[in-house]
Structures are given as C-alpha cells and as structure tokens.
Amino acid sequence: MTYRRIPLYLSCLFLLALSGCNSKRPPLVEIPEPLEELQTMSPATRQAGSLWDSNQNSLFSDRKASNVGDIVTVLIEEKSSASKNASTKTGKDSSIGASIPNLFGLEKSSIIANNHIDMNNLIGASFKNDFKGAGSTSRSGTLSAALSTQVIVKYPNGQLKIRGGKEVMVNNEVQVIYLTGIIRPVDITAANTINSDKILNARISYTGKGALGDKQEPGWLTRSLDHVWPF
C-alpha cells in the first residue's frame, strides 16, 4: 500500500511547487522618511521694534531652501561613459644543440659506425612559444529626472544635507529613485532648483522590481550552475 501512494505524494508535491510559482505582487520598496533625521529647529529670534527679521530670507531675493525641513528640487542629469582597451603580445624562440666528436675513442667503435651515428649532431632541440591577447570594455549610462528633496541637516558652515526619494508603480512594476548628498545654498537657483553635478557625495540610485526585472535575470538553476560549472 505504501508504494502505491508514492505517485500520489509526488503529484501533491508537484502541485505545491506550481502554486509557489504563481506571480505575486512585488512589495513596495520603503524609502526612509526624511523627517526622521530632522534636527530640532530653534525659534526665530525677533527684536523689539524691528520690522525686519534677519533670520528670514532677503527682501530682494526669491524664497530658496535654507533651513532644515525646506524642500529643494534636484535636476538630475547624469551621464557617464568609460572604455578601456588592452593588448598583449609575447614571443620566445630558443634552440639548443650539442656534439661530441671525441669521446675516449668510442666514436671510432663499430657500434657507432654500424649505426651511422653522427657524433657532431648528437643533441638538437628547439622551443618556440607565442602568446597574443586582447581585450576591451566599455560602459555608458544616462539618467535624467527631477526629484524633490528635503533639507535634513544644516551644518555650521551653512551647507545643507538633502535627501529624497520617489516610488512609482505601474502594472505591478515598481520604480524607485533615491538621492542624498550635500549642497551649498549659493548653488540653488532662483527657482529653488539645483543641478545634480553640484551635489557633494551624491548617492543616486534608480532601481526597479517587478515582472520586467525578473525577466532580465537568469533563473536560480542557471545562477547555481554558473557558480559550480568548471568550464
């Protein structure tokens, strides 16, 4: 009876394996909330009898991000390209020869004469080795986007640390863009924007997860074979 149930057990395991292959909705990638690292802001200092507060923005300029909690828009325009070529060529050619015209008179013996042994050409060898190798690699990337970020730290020298992110989900495909870095208030334009090439220690990531991302990766069995395949 036990042997007859084996096909039933195998069928159940097969159905369970198929159920595990069903497409599931990818979880949303959580972006750290910028407000978590905001420093406590002290209240603005006001002077009695004064109509102008020196802690506020200038009367003659547009309002730009300058304090913790303010928002600034980053215009991301990143282009990168790199290429490298290498070639190697080596060669080696060597030869060796030896003769023994006189060897204790044995060169005149019948053994040498009957076998037609030439004592002047006893040893001869040559070796030649050639190697040629060439390789090239190239990589390029382009990223264009506009991302609103928030000031999370204001340093004593006036520089600002910003951080922001955005999630977009279309047809179960999640696209996440994240940015953090340090900027100078003087680089912020009148429209409260700043270019990404003016960000210090910029960390920009653009990732995706979903059906398209899964199709761009090899299966688990292929990846396992790549690790153990010796050829």
UniProtKB/Swiss-Prot annotation:
- The superkingdom listed in its UniProt entry is Bacteria
Task: Report if keyword Plastid is assigned.
Answer: no
Lipid group attachment sites (N-palmitoyl cysteine)? 21
Keywords, A to Z, come to: Bacterial flagellum, Cell outer membrane, Lipoprotein, Membrane, Palmitate, Signal
Topology in the lipid bilayer is annotated as: Lipid-anchor
Supply the InterPro entries for this chain. Flag_Lring (IPR000527)
Q: What compartments host this protein?
A: Cell outer membrane; Bacterial flagellum basal body
Q: Does Cell division count among this protein's keywords?
A: no
Lipid positions (S-diacylglycerol cysteine): 21
Q: Which Pfam families match?
A: FlgH
> Which range is the signal sequence, renumbered to this chain?
1-20
Q: What is a GO molecular function of this protein?
A: cytoskeletal motor activity
> What is one Gene Ontology biological process annotated in the Swiss-Prot or TrEMBL record?
bacterial-type flagellum-dependent cell motility
Give the record's subunit note. Answer: The basal body constitutes a major portion of the flagellar organelle and consists of four rings (L,P,S, and M) mounted on a central rod.
HAMAP family under this entry?
FlgH
Q: Which family is this protein grouped under?
A: Belongs to the FlgH family.
This chain's protein is named Flagellar L-ring protein
**Organism of derivation:** Desulfotalea psychrophila (strain LSv54 / DSM 12343)
| The organism's taxonomic lineage, starting at the top | Bacteria, Pseudomonadati, Thermodesulfobacteriota, Desulfobulbia, Desulfobulbales
**What gene is this protein a product of?**
flgH
